[in-house]
From Swiss-Prot:
GO biological process, one term: vesicle-mediated transport
Record has Nucleotide-binding as a keyword: no
Location of the protein in the cell: Golgi apparatus; Endoplasmic reticulum
Protein name as catalogued: Protein transport protein SEC16B homolog
Phosphoserine carried by residues: 46
Length: 1361
């Protein structure tokens, strides 16, 4: 910034110089005579006042129109001068325009006394060759006449090789950076009120650096170096250098002011000026005129950033004034329709600085006039738009595109009493506004076009104006390079013009239009924007979109990968999209086919990523430790610790504990090397050697005398812990544990790993986290460590948690999981280290829980307490899946059920980024894991997974539910053919009937099955052997090409078979009986032909139906039902088929009396009657058992009459468990079988097989006989009696309390029940009726069953009848 002394040297002129210069009365001799006068003389001001006085000068006409060309300085009133060294005073109330002058809102002037200010300036030395200069004010003749301008370049040696300088030097030396100045020969200073003057020493920030313009509203001229530049300032006029005269160009209208060219005097202007723009003027007329007003012509200082004010799609051409080409609409349009948007009057707004500690910079645009020699009352003035800009500091760099303002020129009638638009009424629109110098073109005939608002537009032809285009930040301090303006460093009230409607193009709530963005399924990003230009021109509100809207469907992964934040360092590299896209696991681990090599590669990459420089050291160290722990778990099949009590030697060589301990040791070494972990001390007190010698001698003497207790106590007090542990081990386990505890508490530092291990060995886990010490003994001359700082809680334990966890893991003790778990809780709650806490939980093998306030583990490394909504991140899900996979390596049946919902979430995340195939694999893996679950939440999870899988499948098929892809269609047809060929070919052949030699019951049972095949619509009873599948499940087959094996359940006996009609198949075929009685079908050609013809037609029909599906939307109700229920027959009957003839009813079974057999010796029935003559048993009588139906063997019942041979011998007979009878205690049945009447071959009633003898039974059932145990032999009570042996009741597991009917003796020794009451078992408690002939005297052995307390819980309830 130029100093005051520089201004004093440059301003060494006086009033006489200008008077003589204007009156053409100046001569070189006078200039030389006055060259010695160098002082500035003012009436009452200081040396700096001449600067302000000179800055208020302007070139203008004679106020009175006399044309004498005198210098007149207008009266200034209520001016406020700011002489501060750093700052400018804000303008509170901008003054209005005086009737006789034009206001300079920010002129730098001081308050002047009286109504006139005179300046006495010393004469400057001029060359003697200077000619006279006169002012000519005649119409058609230039107002300035130059006789000889060469004198300004004379005397180069006097002015540092530049002479006095040219006319441009006269102003540029005032300010080395001033440029783009225009001026006239006449000077007039405007009058104004409440003017704010800034000290010129402090009004420009970064003045020297930016080639900017000095902040003076001063009269100045343009920096020109030749006559061509002067001719550009006066369009229509030409300067003749030889004669020094100005001549008007023929055919040119001076009032048009067309083709103005603006040049910049700064050295950098040529480097930044690029484009062309058009200037638009608006003329505003006033209501009245006041006589005697002075026409004031000010200068317009060009702003360096000159954007044309129009959108980029508007292209102008000088050949077509008044028109512009719209590149979007591809057509020419009139500029008048576009200019109507600028009719709105700005509103005054006081912009408030909203950001604290911010500076407000105001750029003052210059007033500029276009002089019309015919209309002396016309003044062209720019509306003033002060742009506020907020900065954080003076050293910030700015993008010039964010510093924007708008200038609009308005020609104004000088005779106006009051202006319609004044600078005081113009408002400033804050924010990032574009610097627009609004230019327009138009024909001369439309010079004054009235508008409804009373604003007339003065439209010149197209002009060439340099436009600054700057892309990138410019490093400078709060000097706006783009505008080359000065900056005031204090907030002010500033005015501007809002050239657009604030509500134009906005919604009802005032929001501007914007593009619409939405996310689509499958990683799609849908973008909808308006291409009609409404977004670009929304601030003007005058253009209507003609280009329409466009919808773009983008891949989300490509958009994210192309962004700058995706590849940047920091947390973004581990962000959501990065983890799913580039760092995702290689497919589902559980239920997938991932290779171990790929998995270890992924782990190595993640661990290496934790060591990057951008990640925080503490977090990176913990995350690396967690991933390394998971890798160890995969290497040792899900085990991080060996079971307690395993081989200690194996633990040291190759075990999970050794790997985990090594991991913590490496982490500790890294921390010590990096200075993060100090070396810890373990011992509290070190007794001196002399004291240790005394203690050892005393302990030795006590042991020699046999006083072990006193020796142990002496060793503990003297801290001689070695001998103390040996003595305590001899005294017992309790003494040993107590000694270890005393040593840990009294000598080891709290929180040290050695103390932790000693306390765990002593069985004192509660003392691990204590910080107190019981050592209060001080030894004379002992070496004590520095006192420990008082610590709260278990902070000392947490400081070295890695070492403590490592020593606990490597040295397994009882219940150390509780200590590890508590350590993790403390790390989470007190330190907030979630990763460290989860490391402890994984080593302690804690279970994963569902989300709750008390759950410890939901996802590995995720804090569900602190971040309940976002803890389910992709990284945490990947780590948890890795842990689940390590567990399944050791146990293939392991399922982490609570983790399956997070897998579904991960599948959704993968689908969002476009990885649909991987997401579908996860859905299939989750469904596979949920097969075994039966809880309600599992069923809900299955529905979610199925819906997601279906949505992915439909999306992959292009939105169609049926996949008609040629490759997949072939597979569907092949599966379909395979399912159709299953019916004619048939499944598993029916098994041959199983029979047992010598077992009449089995033959009769098979005979009943064979006869049942004659019944219509019935299904034969299962006759397959145990090698065949169960009867309720038919052979499985592939169904419908779905790849799933489905078991088709058979129907019950009463359910009709709608798929097959055995009556129709048997009607046309001949039947024959086999030798064994099994019905066989004759294979005839007609049957086979019809069968295969139906098969071929069915294939053709179904194939055509699947491939050529009907496009109609009619419901397919299927064929009419051919079956109906016949109320008379009480069964289902097929239409058109004769019902089978009614079969004859079965004859009644033979009566019991017809098969009485007295061969068993039951004649003496009185011997069996007890003394009371009452049988309270509900079982059959001996007479009933002597019927023709043979009694069932005592070793089996009627439900297991068939022999247990072959495979059946390996299975448990639930109806006849072993141990119910014993050959030694039970009386065998007679060897001779009882006779029975012959049974017809085709008898249709069930006849049980004859019971096998005991010997045969024992031979047929060797396995069962060997497993029978004697249960009641030890409890028998032998009683001498002449009566025959009583009826034996077979014992069942729950019949200990049954009354011994017939004996009169209860189990507990009480008397029997009265005859009116009886007891029956709630289970199948039948009585054995096997007796032997009376070969001995009347004696009987009453058997008392032992009632053990162990069977009380298994006893069945007895029913009182």
């Amino acid at each position: 910034m130029a100093s005051a002394s520089q201004f004093l040297l440059e301003d060494q002129t006086d009033e006489d110089f200008f008077d003589k210069l204007v009156d053409d009365a100046y001569s070189p001799t006078e200039a030389q005579a006055s060259s010695s006068v160098t002082e500035l003389k003012f009436d009452d001001e200081s040396d700096s006042d001449d600067i302000r006085a000179f800055s208020n000068l302007s070139i203008g006409k004679d106020p009175l129109g006399g044309g004498d060309g005198t210098l007149n300085e207008a009266i200034l009133g209520n001016d406020v001068a700011n002489e501060g060294a750093s700052g400018s005073v804000g303008e509170d109330e901008p003054s209005s325009i005086a009737p006789e002058a034009v206001q300079f809102p920010h002129s730098d002037a001081r308050e002047l006394r009286d109504d006139e200010m005179r300046s006495e300036v010393a004469d400057m030395p001029l060359s003697e060759t200077a000619k006279e200069c006169t002012i000519v004010n005649e119409p058609g003749i230039p107002g300035v006449k130059e006789l000889d301008w060469g004198s300004f370049d004379a005397d180069l040696s006097v002015n540092d090789g530049r002479g006095f300088g040219s006319y441009s030097d006269f102003f540029t030396e005032l300010d080395a950076t001033a440029g783009n100045l225009q001026g006239k020969a006449d000077v007039a200073v405007a009058t104004g009120g409440n003017l704010v003057a800034n000290d010129t020493n402090n009004t420009s920030v970064g003045f020297e650096q930016h080639q900017g313009q000095l902040h003076h509203d001063s009269a100045s001229g343009q920096y020109v170096d030749n006559s061509q530049s002067w001719e550009n300032l006066y369009p229509g006029w030409k300067y003749d250098a030889s004669t020094g005269q100005w001549f008007q160009v023929d055919g040119h209208d001076a009032s048009m002011n067309s083709q103005e060219s603006y040049e910049n005097s700064t050295s950098n202007w040529e480097n930044v000026a690029a484009n062309n723009s058009d200037v638009a003027y608006q003329r505003q007329s006033t209501a009245s005129a006041v006589a005697g007003t002075v026409e004031n012509v000010s200068t317009w200082n060009q702003v360096s950033q000159v954007s044309n004010g129009y959108p980029e799609h508007m292209v102008f051409d000088s050949q077509y004034p008044g028109w512009y080409y719209d590149t979007i609409a591809q057509e020419w349009r009139s500029l008048d329709s576009y200019n109507q948007a600028f009719q709105t009057t700005g509103q005054a707004n006081d912009q408030q600085v909203q950001n604290g500690n911010s500076f407000t910079a105001v750029d003052h645009s210059r007033e500029s006039n276009v002089h019309d020699v015919y209309d002396k009352n016309q003044i062209l003035r720019t509306q003033k738009f002060d742009i506020q800009s907020q900065h954080g500091s003076w050293d910030q760099s700015y993008y010039d595109k964010n510093q924007q303002a708008t200038n609009m020129w308005q020609p104004e009638n000088a005779g106006a009493a009051e202006a319609a638009v004044t600078p005081a009424s113009l408002s400033n629109s804050g924010g990032n506004q574009q610097v627009n110098n609004l230019y327009s073109t138009g024909p001369v005939a439309e010079q004054f076009k009235p508008y409804e608002s009373g604003v007339q537009s003065f439209i010149p032809q197209h002009m060439n104006v340099a436009n600054v285009t700057q892309n990138g930040p410019m490093s400078f301090s709060n000097g706006f390079y783009s505008r080359q303006e000065s900056v005031d460093d204090a907030p002010q009230s500033f005015q501007s013009s809002q050239l657009f409607s604030p509500s134009a193009g906005r919604s009802s709530d005032g929001r501007p239009p914007h593009a619409l963005v939405n996310f689509g399924f499958g990683g799609k990003l849908i973008l909808m924007k308006d291409d009609s230009g409404s977004l670009q021109n929304s601030s003007f509100g005058s253009q209507k979109g003609t280009g329409g809207s466009s919808i773009s469907v983008l891949n989300l992964a490509e958009v994210i990968s192309g962004s700058a934040s995706y590849s940047s360092l920091g947390e973004n590299s581990l962000s959501y999209f990065s983890c799913l896209d580039q760092q995702s696991l290689p497919g589902p681990l559980v239920g997938g086919n991932v290779g171990s090599k790929d998995l270890h590669k992924w782990l190595d990459e993640r661990i290496l990523n934790c060591e990057s420089s951008y990640m925080d050291f503490s977090r990176g160290k913990l995350l690396k430790m967690l991933l390394s722990l998971l890798r160890i778990s995969c290497q040792y099949y899900g085990k991080l610790r060996s079971p307690f009590g395993s081989d200690a030697l194996q633990k040291e060589t190759d075990s999970a504990e050794a790997a985990v301990a090594k991991l913590f040791a490496i982490a500790k070494e890294d921390g010590v090397q990096n200075g993060y972990a100090p070396i810890s001390q373990c011992l509290q007190h070190l007794p001196p050697e002399s004291q240790m010698q005394v203690t050892a001698s005393e302990v030795q003497n006590l042991l020699a005398s046999g006083r072990k207790m006193e020796a142990l106590q002496c060793a503990q007090e003297g801290h001689l812990w070695g001998p103390a542990l040996v003595i305590a081990a001899q005294l017992g386990q309790q003494f040993y544990v107590d000694t270890v505890k005393q040593m840990a508490l009294r000598q080891l530092v709290p929180g040290s790993p050695l103390r932790t291990l000693c306390l765990l060995v002593a069985g004192q886990p509660a003392e691990v986290f204590s910080t107190g010490s019981t050592s209060d003994i001080s030894f004379p001359g002992s070496v004590n460590l520095p006192p420990q700082q008082p610590q709260f809680g278990c902070s000392s334990m947490l400081d070295s948690w890695e070492e403590n966890l490592g020593i606990i893991t490597a040295n397994r003790t009882t219940d150390d999981e509780l200590v590890i778990t508590h350590l993790g809780d403390c790390m989470w709650k007190e330190r907030g280290e979630i990763i460290a806490a989860h490391i402890c939980y994984l080593i302690a093998d804690k279970n994963f829980d569902t989300y709750s306030d008390t759950a410890r583990l939901c996802l590995v490394g995720a804090d569900h307490w602190k971040y309940p909504r976002t803890y389910a991140s992709p990284e945490a899900i990947q780590r948890t899946e890795l842990y689940e996979y390590s567990k399944t390596l050791g146990n293939s049946q392991y399922t982490l059920l609570t983790f399956q919902p997070y897998k579904v979430m991960y599948a959704h995340m993968l689908a969002e980024v476009g990885k649909l195939s991987t997401a579908q694999k996860y859905c299939q893996a989750v469904l596979k894991c949920l097969k075994t679950g039966r809880s309600p939440e599992v069923e809900m999870w299955k529905q979610f997974v199925s819906s997601l899988e279906e949505r992915i499948r439909i999306h992959q098929q292009g939105g169609y539910t049926a996949n008609l892809h040629p490759e997949k269609l072939v597979g569907v047809l092949l599966n379909f053919f395979g399912s159709k060929t299953h019916r004619p070919v048939g499944g598993m052949p029916p098994p041959a009937p199983h029979s047992t030699k010598g077992n009449l019951q089995g033959n009769e049972y098979q005979h009943q099955q064979q006869e049942a095949t004659k019944l219509a619509y019935s299904q034969s009873v299962n006759t397959m052997s145990s090698l065949m599948p169960p009867a309720s499940v038919e052979p499985t087959h592939e169904s419908g090409g779905s790849g799933r094996r489905m078991a088709v359940h058979t129907r019950s006996v009463s359910e009709p078979d709608f798929g097959r009609t055995p009556i129709q198949e048997m009607a046309d075929s001949s039947k024959e009986k086999a030798v064994d009685g099994v019905t066989k079908l004759k294979s005839s050609g007609s049957v086979a032909g019809s069968r295969f013809s139906r098969f071929g037609f069915g294939i053709f029909k179904d194939t055509v139906g699947r491939v050529l599906a009907r496009s109609s939307k009619e419901a397919k109700l299927g064929a009419e039902n051919q079956f109906y229920y016949d109320d008379k027959l009480k069964r289902w009957v097929e239409r058109g088929v004769e019902p089978p003839a009614e079969e004859a009813a079965l004859p009644p079974p033979p009566t019991i009396g017809a098969f009485q057999n007295n061969s068993l010796g039951y004649e003496n029935k009185s011997d069996m009657i007890p003394s009371n003559g009452n049988w309270s048993s509900g079982g059959p009588t001996p007479s009933e058992n002597s019927s023709g139906i043979p009694p069932i063997s005592h070793g089996s019942n009627q439900f297991s009459a068939r022999g247990r041979t072959g495979v059946r011998a390996r299975y448990v007979d639930t109806y006849n468990p072993p141990g119910r009878g014993n050959s030694h205690t039970m009386i065998p049945s007679p060897s001779v079988q009882t006779a029975k009447p012959p049974i017809p071959a085709k008898a249709k009633f069930f006849v049980p097989a004859a019971p096998a003898s005991f010997s045969n039974d024992q031979a047929m059932e060797p396995a069962a006989a060997e497993t029978r145990q004697e249960e009641i032999s030890a409890d028998e009570v032998v009683a001498s009696s002449g009566a025959p042996p009583p009826m034996m009741m077979q014992r069942y597991p729950s019949m200990d309390n049954i009354q011994r009917n017939g004996l009169g003796i209860s189990v507990n020794g009480d008397n029997h029940q009265p005859p009116t009451s009886r007891r029956t078992a709630s289970w199948s408690g039948n009585f054995n009726t096997s007796f032997t002939p009376p070969t001995s005297p009347s004696t009987f052995k009453p058997v008392l069953l032992n009632s053990s307390s162990s069977s009380l819980g298994e006893e069945l309830q007895e029913v009182e009848l």
